[in-house]
Amino acid sequence: MQKDTLKPGEAPVRAAPHTPMMTQYHAIKAEYPDTLVFYRMGDFYEVFYADAEKASSLLDITLTKRGQSAGEPVVMAGIPFHALEGYLAKLIKLGESVAICEQVGDVATAKGPVERKVVRVVTPGTLTDTELLSDKTESILLAVHQGARNTCGLAWLSVTQGEIHLAHCANGELETWLARIAPSELLYNVDATPAFEQRLQTQRCAASARPAWQFDAALGVRRLLDQLKVASLASWHAEGLNEAHAAASALLGYAEHTQGRALPHVQGLQVVRSGELIELPPATRRNLELTQTLRGEDSPTLFSLLDTCTTGMGSRALKSWLLSPRRDRAQAASRLEAITQLRSGAQQTLRTQLKGCSDVERITARIALRQVRPRELVALQLTLQKAELLTPVDSAQIPLLTTIFEDLQPPLGCAELLGQCILDEPAALIRDGGVINHGLDAELDELRAIQTNCDGFLLDLEIREKARTGIANLRVQFNKVHGFYIEVTQGQLDKVPADYRRRQTLKNAERYITPELKTFEDKALSAQERALAREKWLYEQLLDQLQEFVPALSRLARAIAALDALCALAERSLTLNWCAPVFVKEPCIAIGQGRHPVVEARLAETGGGAFIANDCSLTGKSRMQMITGPNMGGKSTYMRQVALIVLLASVGSYVPASACRLGPIDAIHTRIGAADDVANAQSTFMLEMLEAAQILHAATPYSLVLMDEIGRGTSTFDGLALAGGIAAYLHNKAQAFTLFATHYFELTEFAAQHHGAMNVHVSAVESGSDIVFLHHIEPGPASKSYGIAVAKLAGVPAAVVNHARHALAALEAQQSQASAQVDLFAAPPEAPASGQTAIDKALASIDPDILSPREALEALYQLKKLASAA
């Protein structure tokens, strides 16, 4: 402990206080300790201290020190206010959150620092600004609450979409749910267990722990009731979901906090139950390259192939359909029905008419949140006019299209109101003025007239002053810094009248003001300020009037999105020559001449030749295919195309095949590819076994399972034994539809011993020492492995290839001499009988507590003798 060194009578030195402005800053920063605070000062947003150091590093802006506060230099960095959106985009991409602190007080009347407050908090999961959002991807905020009974509750929403989702799941299903939701930002209870928190941290999104009191189920119910303006959640079947209600409490509280206001446009609620959706685990989404390639790129993927939508709303709807197919066939059947109707020619006309439509969904959210920009309102007006002209489709027998076209009707009077209030080409921001239409408000028109007449007055004054003073090059001008002035060059200063008052001295001229010009300046500048204030007030009044249109605009947005997505699927089905799947009740996957849609498209783009189509038939009696054949022969492509066709059909799309019959499906599981997870200290083989274990626990008779080269991450015998055991489990226990590709030729015996399995192979032809891949799936096992031929094709040196051929011949000769054969698929041997052995009896007779050292040694020799005899 430090001793007091003050002398008697000496007063302690007090720390210097913060300046008034920094006192204000620290008070605001205390409310947002984990968030970068952008503090508005004039034409800049400033960041201070640790925030400044962080922003300087992330944004590559200059870090400096200015003045002192509390006896210490003020570390700071800044950005121009007009460049805010660009810097926000960078920070959001890095997972940061930013509190925007604006000047809300009047600078002219402020005593001390002008009043400031945080008007919004921009976070990765609560974005509403179109400049910060991807057209094709939702920004989703997710709250997760760990329950007490091995369950967790989830609540999520896209602030721009306006619908809350609730779900319960078992802890073991959490990764699948997280992959399905794909949140941009995740909230969890600070009291969550370390293991639970670690599972959440694996998500590549911003994650933050929130106080435990925010996860309150009763508060969540109240917030949901208030948000939806209802007295009960019964109509949504959302009662009794305590963990999800707790998550909803944190979700809504956080969303309102970041927006700085209520969310009036959020009026939808959907309870998503585990058994309603076809399960697509993270490995399936990754291996099938639904929205990202294995390299993390956006193209070529299934979504990039399908997405010919003309609007961002349509693209987002299509992606949502693709990632959340339902087990219930009603939704898929209704989409198929609509697509079939649109294929008749209507899709081409509608796609042309939809082109250029604005993002009504996001503009509507920004209207509700009072953040909408003037030019967005002009874009909305044009879209409303387009919607009125959309060509109706004969949808009398198509309920989905009937609903869509009913909702496509623009709200009455909305377009007219926007046209009446907003200029055709307004300024980008209301703060700049030049937004409100002429003739709307007499007071604004009068103030604008004063500004308009300004040029005429200045020209007239200049002519008069030239005549009065005899200064031919005299100029009457204006700038924002010094206001109005009369400029006289150095050579004419002797002619300046006595009533001129010097305003500014330049190198080659002087600037003056006269009483007449000063009077006009006061009037003109006052008119400008008053006109801007009037425009802002009128704009707020317009936003008030637009609130009543929000529900209808939300319906219109959903209708445009659905129609656009359906038209895109109709166009794809025609352009790519796809067929309509047929849904049946009996268990089956029957595909005629199926193709991998993405590979086929890439071959067409690159001139790589025609794609080789293949049939696939899996039924209740024949559920498993054992697939053999050379690497590069097309096994993985065939397996993936079957899964993609099943997925597309389940979404309600046409499929790349000549025919398709599909029974009920509850999940698509894949075990494909190999890579170490170094960050989590998991080897290739461990990851392989983890994925296999998850599949074996989850697969049912309604699941489609793809197993590609299981067991290759360990020794040959280990791998072969494991592959045989996994195949037997999938056949006997899970009874799932299974495509089982293997490089173990021994597994071709599996079909002979299991009635529900069949052998197929990808064909290839050898010509001398060369190999030609035919890519056809044919009945029966492969006649041989072509690994050495593939190695030669890959460019392995000839010496290595020749050595491998000789070694292979020797190994095959050695194998043919072995007489014993192991039955890989026999039932496990029974455990040995539990009767006591001689060793057991001897051990039972020994009491170690009473043995002398010599007796203990004798007993040990006796046990060793018994063990040798056994």
From Swiss-Prot:
Highest taxon of source: Bacteria
Record function comment: This protein is involved in the repair of mismatches in DNA. It is possible that it carries out the mismatch recognition step. This protein has a weak ATPase activity.
Organism expressing this protein natively: Polaromonas naphthalenivorans (strain CJ2)
Record PANTHER family: DNA MISMATCH REPAIR PROTEIN MSH1, MITOCHONDRIAL (PTHR11361:SF34), DNA MISMATCH REPAIR PROTEIN MUTS FAMILY MEMBER (PTHR11361)
Ligand binding (ATP): G629, P630, N631, M632, G633, G634, K635, S636
Protein name, entry field: DNA mismatch repair protein MutS
Gene responsible for this protein: mutS
BP-aspect Gene Ontology terms: mismatch repair
Keyword terms of this UniProt record: ATP-binding, DNA damage, DNA repair, DNA-binding, Nucleotide-binding
